[in-house]
Each structure stands twice: as C-alpha cells, then as structure tokens.
Swiss-Prot record:
Main location: secreted
Keyword line: Secreted
Protein name: Equinin A
Superkingdom of source: Eukaryota
Function: Peptide with unknown function. Does not show antimicrobial and hemolytic activities.
UniProt-annotated stretches for the region Disordered: 1-27
Bias (Basic and acidic residues): 1-13
Compartments where found: Secreted
C-alpha cells in the first residue's frame, strides 16, 4: 500500500527492520 503524506517514517523503520531480519524490504 502506498501512503501519501504521513506514515513515511513508520515505513522507513519497518523496511529497516525487515533488512535487519534478512527479509526482502521493498521501497
């Protein structure tokens, strides 16, 4: 899902966690 405006910080944090977990973090 693409969020316009808010939620960017949360998405970045989520993607970072996925990368740390060795998962596929897109975006």
């Amino acid at each position: 899902a693409v969020d316009k405006g808010g939620g960017k910080a949360e998405k970045k944090d989520g993607n970072r966690k996925k990368k740390l977990a060795g998962g596929e973090g897109g975006g």
